[in-house]
Amino acid sequence: MAGAGLIGIRRRIKSVTNIRKITKAMGLVSTAKLRKARVNLEINKKYYNEYKVILKDIINFIEDSNIYIDGNGSHKKLYVIFTSDSGLCGSFNINIINNVINEIKEDKENSLVIVIGQKGRMYLKKLGINTLAEYIEIPDVPTTKEARTIAKNIIKLYSSKEVGEVFLVYSEFYSPVKQQVLINKILPFTKENKSDNKYIEFNPPVTQFMDEILENYLKATILNCFSNSKASENGSRMTAMNGATDNANDLLDNLDLQFNRLRQSAITQEISEIVGGAEAQR
């Protein structure tokens, strides 16, 4: 009886040991990817913040009517959702999806969705939410190529009045254990009250290259979202895998203890049987 129990525990120890090898390896890979993602995030953040300052000045000094500032009259809202292609990253994806669901549940008819990432597509399909476009297999270090494709699609949808507002839903990275889901409105732009006496004159008129400015800004914004999303994903996966490895270690300690106790019990029982047999033969 004890022998069967020992075999079962030995199998569990082998199984948990194999799982621990996988989680430890994935944790190490995620750590390396996170390090690279954080470097990329810092570079993109500087460019994005500088471009935001420039765009703010441009918007505040445009006096002509412009659909990118005044709106296009459409009541449709577009949500561009940034999720991951791979799983095993804790609550990273589900937190984003839950925020989207809470945001659109009051006005489903006027809410449209573009999803980035296999996991987001899978969740939305299960929930019966249709998508306008899907982008998958985004590289670990996203480039302007991916950002440009999405930016052009957004501009097309907005300029054709298919959507009247555009929101980006992504996870802002703060640390490996802290990320926050943000829903940022990017179109139409919002003018701010001029609080200084700054005067800017554009030559040629800024309206002549507004489309180019818009596309470059959207590319910078989307790239910033990509960078935050990748860092958040790898931070979540690293934390999840390290936690899984720690749990596996705890489980192995308990299994080793059970194995040793059972083996000790079996040895004690065998000794008792031998002693009992010897006594019976006297």
Swiss-Prot record:
It is found in: Cell membrane. One of its GO terms (molecular function) is proton-transporting ATP synthase activity, rotational mechanism. Keywords: ATP synthesis, Cell membrane, CF(1), Hydrogen ion transport, Ion transport, Membrane, Transport. Coiled coil: none annotated. It is a peripheral membrane protein. Disulfide bonds: none annotated. Its main location: membrane. HAMAP family: ATP_synth_gamma_bact (MF_00815). Produces ATP from ADP in the presence of a proton gradient across the membrane. The gamma chain is believed to be important in regulating ATPase activity and the flow of protons through the CF(0) complex. F-type ATPases have 2 components, CF(1) - the catalytic core - and CF(0) - the membrane proton channel. CF(1) has five subunits: alpha(3), beta(3), gamma(1), delta(1), epsilon(1). CF(0) has three main subunits: a, b and c. This is ATP synthase gamma chain. It comes from Clostridium botulinum (strain Langeland / NCTC 10281 / Type F). The lineage of its organism: Bacteria, Bacillati, Bacillota, Clostridia, Eubacteriales.
